């Protein structure tokens, strides 16, 4: 492979990565969410959502209502949580939410940060679930939880790259 082909291959890969990044950032701006697509990681929302479902979020509504499925983050924890709004109250400017997983026995007070009784809709929510694809995200769970699957995927990608020259 000559220098021109290698440079073309590099530029093609750079274009693919930059296009993917721009598509993600555009989706983030449109949905007003830093993470507009999430994968369900646990069974706490069964039967509504199963582990591995991909959820599409929207974060442009001013208020959430009881029954909405929301994704929120706790300060100091990296993993977003998908649960249903159990109770809400608000004052003139802020809305506060109490959530619970459909498959859980108790509400989420024990999950919230210390001395936090409710979620602040403006600061804690990543978004409200508007659509989903069942089981499609299970591949990401398999790769993140299984070291052998990760190495197998990496090996397949390397072999494919060597054989096709791309």
Swiss-Prot record:
Subcellular localization: Endoplasmic reticulum membrane
Transmembrane regions listed in the UniProt entry: 10-30
Protein's membrane topology: Single-pass type II membrane protein
GO cellular component terms, semicolon-separated: signal peptidase complex
Main subcellular location: endoplasmic reticulum
Chain positions covered by the region annotation C-terminal short (CTS) helix: 152-163
Keywords: Endoplasmic reticulum, Hydrolase, Membrane, Protease, Signal-anchor, Transmembrane, Transmembrane helix
Swiss-Prot/TrEMBL catalytic activity: Cleavage of hydrophobic, N-terminal signal or leader sequences from secreted and periplasmic proteins
Presence of the UniProt keyword Endoplasmic reticulum in the record: yes
EC number(s) from the headed UniProt entry: 3.4.21.89
GO MF, any single term: serine-type endopeptidase activity
Source organism superkingdom: Eukaryota
Pfam family for this entry, one: Peptidase_S24
Residue stretches in coiled coil: none
Any one of the GO BP annotations: signal peptide processing
Top-level class of the enzyme under EC nomenclature: hydrolase
Segments on the Cytoplasmic side according to the record's topology features: 1-9
Residues of the signal peptide: none
Active site: 44, 83, 108
Keyword presence, Transferase: no
Ranges in the topological domain labelled Lumenal: 31-166
Function: Catalytic component of the signal peptidase complex (SPC) which catalyzes the cleavage of N-terminal signal sequences from nascent proteins as they are translocated into the lumen of the endoplasmic reticulum. Specifically cleaves N-terminal signal peptides that contain a hydrophobic alpha-helix (h-region) shorter than 18-20 amino acids.
Note on domains (UniProt): The C-terminal short (CTS) helix is essential for catalytic activity. It may be accommodated as a transmembrane helix in the thinned membrane environment of the complex, similarly to the signal peptide in the complex substrates.
Subunit composition and interactions: Component of the signal peptidase complex (SPC) composed of a catalytic subunit SEC11 and three accessory subunits SPC1, SPC2 and SPC3. The complex induces a local thinning of the ER membrane which is used to measure the length of the signal peptide (SP) h-region of protein substrates. This ensures the selectivity of the complex towards h-regions shorter than 18-20 amino acids. SPC associates with the translocon complex.
Family: Belongs to the peptidase S26B family.
Protein name: Signal peptidase complex catalytic subunit SEC11
Classification of source organism: Eukaryota, Fungi, Dikarya, Ascomycota, Saccharomycotina
